[in-house]
Every structure is written in structure tokens, then in C-alpha cells.
Amino acid sequence: MKREHSNQYFTEAQKLFPGGVNSPVRAFKAVGGHPLFIEKASGAYLHDVDGNRYIDYVLSWGPMILGHAPKDVLPAVEEAIWEGTSFGAPSPREIALGQLVQERLPFMERMRMVNSGTEATMSAIRVARGVTKRSKIVKFIGCYHGHSDSFLVQAGSGLASFGIADSAGVIAQVAGETLALPYNDTDALKTCFEKYGDDIACVILEAVAGNMGLIPADADFINTIRSLTQEYGSLFIVDEVMSGFRAHYQGAVGLYQTEPDLVCLGKVIGGGFPVAAFGGKAVYMDQVAPLGSIYQAGTLSGNPVAMTAGYETLKQLTPELFAEIEEKTSYLCDGLRSLADKYSISLQVVSKGTMFGFFFSQKPVRNFEDSKAADHAQFARLHGLLLEEGIYLAPSQYETNFMSSAHTRADLDQTLAAFEQAFQEMKEEANG
């Protein structure tokens, strides 16, 4: 495929933005080459500035569960735009979205709309510290909760793609309040609470981790977190910025039938607009300003256009439609497993709901150490081969892929055919 114009745009972008991008993973550093510059998107497809079309499994990193430019959402968004793009005041549209979220997640007795997943997670941590009067937080190695200083300790995802354990610019005093433990390790968790339990404000968890590749938590691990946080008076926060309304119709909390104290949402609830939320039990959330002394604010929080996009997206995402998207995910993943077996390729294919990923690994991947040990060079080669065939996957083995209602069976079969061609070529290369 020709990429002349993408390369030209990338040259210009590097004069303006660090690395030529406005989010690091878009730079394609983990897979080689230059990023694609996208001109438009519709349904399951991206169209780049060179006129190439790609079947898209990145879907803006998860939000576009109905596909790009969904016809059942855009008319309401256009109407909202003409009624005013930002009020800086409450509107009925934020109530409509909040009620729909609460209907699906009843334990979210109170919530606050914000503009990004990072804003949601950092605010939830502030609530936990304000409520408990404690300073330490527990996170898990490889889980990414945004780029707030407290979270950039063994954070996986973008940092891992660049071989960075922690970010420069995070002062030691802040990093020292974050206790980073191995994912899916109940013994390490128990030991941590025995040592620091009275100082721990909260445990924050990606119950379906999507930033060290797709790695679901063990049910026993989640149950242990819930019991220890209750025993020690710490809050349990589930970060569902990625998995919310993706891993299950009710997100990871629905998948595992657990009830955290606070939850963070994002991506899908904005329908492609910058929307996120944090919320949970009223006893905690009612301590947020203006009712309480835990401060959080945002000029564009509850933006009426973004609220409309989120509302219309969730309204369309019925249990029946979710099941259809989940079935498509299973169909594709079953096909990948069959192809890996056919070509004797050690591939661990993982899916939860409408999310999927895979690792070039001989054994199941349960934590960040397993993920790092997977063959990332093979993934980079595969990514390049698939891109040439018009298949757009997340450009890092540490990232997760997504399915939408817009993907057709023909799209899935074309994708599997491209995988087969790539596997065959990789096998021939390996055999010399």
C-alpha cells in the first residue's frame, strides 16, 4: 500500500508535536514504520490520506463500539451542536446520560462527569485519600490508569511499548506513596496489607487489564482485594475506562459480579467524544465539592454535545446488540486459534466480551512478566503484514483490540484470510 502522503504529514507533524503525535503509541515505535494519517472513518473502516481503506480493530482505542460515524447517533449529536457546544452550566443532557449509566450500574449512586480517563482515575484516588485520610495506594504492575503522577509506576501500556518502567518527572515522594504489586498475585497482596494495611487509602485495579495486552484477573484475586479492603477500611476502585460496557454489558464489575466502592468509566460512555466519569457509593461521593471538601472541577465537564453522544451510544447498546458483538469477537478469536494450530504458531488468543488480544507465547499470560516474555518481534512482523492487507490492529502487543456492531461476517473472514496469509509467510521465513 502507498503511504506517501502519510509520510509527508508525519514529517510536518514532527515539527509541531513531540515525536509527531499527540499520544505516544500512535507513533508505531513498537512495530516499526510511520503512523497512518487518517482522513475519515465510517462503520468498521478507516480511510487514510493515501486513499487506503483498513478494517479497524482499534476503534479509537475502544470508544467506537457502534463503529465510526454511527447513523443512529450522529443526528442527535448534530442537533446538540446547533443548540450550543458548551454552556458551562448544568443541562438535561448530562442527567440523561447519568441515569442511563446508573440504570446499568446501580451501585453508582453518585457520579461526576469528567473529560478523560486520567481525570477520572486521579479524582477517584483523591476521593479515596480524602475519605480515609491515608496516603498510600496499591496498583498492579502493568495496569495503566492514565498519566497522573501517582500511576506512572510500573504502568505497562505506552510506557512498556517504549521500554520505560516509570516516567521521568515523577518525584520520588509521589512515587513512594504508590505500592506496585504483581497482577493476579494474592499472596503479594496479602503481604502488602499485613505490612501497610493501615496506611492504604485504596486499591485500584483493571479487572480486565487491557494495557499489558488483554489479561483478565482471576476471580479469586478480585475477591481477595474486596475482602482485604473491607477488612482494613480501604476503598476498592475498579478502573473500567477501557472495560466499561466492553468486557461485559455491565463491564468488568458485571462480568465478575463484584461491587467496588468506586468505579472509573470512559471511552464507550463518550461515544467517541472526550467523556469519562468516576462514581460509586453516595457515602463517599457526597464528600466531593460542592457538598464536601474533596475538590474536583472542570470547565468542559458534562459538555452537552459529548453527553448526547454518550447517551445515544449507550441507548443503542442493548443487551441483544452487545451479545451480537460478543459473538463476532468469539468467531474471530476461534478462527485465529484454528489458524495458529494449522501453522504450528504458539499464539495465546484472549477475549472478554467485545475485547480481544493475542500473545506470541507458549504459555497462558497472567501478568506483566508473562506479557514482557512474549515474542514482540513476531508481533511487529505480523502487524506490518496485516497492515499491507488492510487490517488495522493496535500497534503494540501491549495493547488491546476491539470489535464493533459495524463489523460484518465478510470483514471477519477477510481478516482471517489476511492472518492466514501472514502466518504462512512468517512460517516460510522461519523455515528459511
UniProtKB/Swiss-Prot annotation:
<dbReference type="InterPro" id="IPR049704">
    <property type="entry name" value="Aminotrans_3_PPA_site"/>
</dbReference>
<keyword id="KW-0663">Pyridoxal phosphate</keyword>
<dbReference type="GO" id="GO:0042286">
    <property type="term" value="F:glutamate-1-semialdehyde 2,1-aminomutase activity"/>
</dbReference>
<dbReference type="GO" id="GO:0005737">
    <property type="term" value="C:cytoplasm"/>
</dbReference>
<dbReference type="GO" id="GO:0008483">
    <property type="term" value="F:transaminase activity"/>
</dbReference>
<dbReference type="InterPro" id="IPR004639">
    <property type="entry name" value="4pyrrol_synth_GluAld_NH2Trfase"/>
</dbReference>
<dbReference type="InterPro" id="IPR015422">
    <property type="entry name" value="PyrdxlP-dep_Trfase_small"/>
</dbReference>
<feature type="modified residue" description="N6-(pyridoxal phosphate)lysine">
    <location>
        <position position="267"/>
    </location>
</feature>
<keyword id="KW-0413">Isomerase</keyword>
<dbReference type="Pfam" id="PF00202">
    <property type="entry name" value="Aminotran_3"/>
</dbReference>
<keyword id="KW-0963">Cytoplasm</keyword>
<comment type="subunit">
    <text>Homodimer.</text>
</comment>
<protein>
    <recommendedName>
        <fullName>Glutamate-1-semialdehyde 2,1-aminomutase</fullName>
        <ecNumber>5.4.3.8</ecNumber>
    </recommendedName>
</protein>
<dbReference type="InterPro" id="IPR015424">
    <property type="entry name" value="PyrdxlP-dep_Trfase"/>
</dbReference>
<comment type="pathway">
    <text>Porphyrin-containing compound metabolism; protoporphyrin-IX biosynthesis; 5-aminolevulinate from L-glutamyl-tRNA(Glu): step 2/2.</text>
</comment>
<dbReference type="GO" id="GO:0006782">
    <property type="term" value="P:protoporphyrinogen IX biosynthetic process"/>
</dbReference>
<dbReference type="InterPro" id="IPR015421">
    <property type="entry name" value="PyrdxlP-dep_Trfase_major"/>
</dbReference>
<keyword id="KW-0627">Porphyrin biosynthesis</keyword>
<dbReference type="InterPro" id="IPR005814">
    <property type="entry name" value="Aminotrans_3"/>
</dbReference>
<dbReference type="GO" id="GO:0030170">
    <property type="term" value="F:pyridoxal phosphate binding"/>
</dbReference>
<comment type="similarity">
    <text>Belongs to the class-III pyridoxal-phosphate-dependent aminotransferase family. HemL subfamily.</text>
</comment>
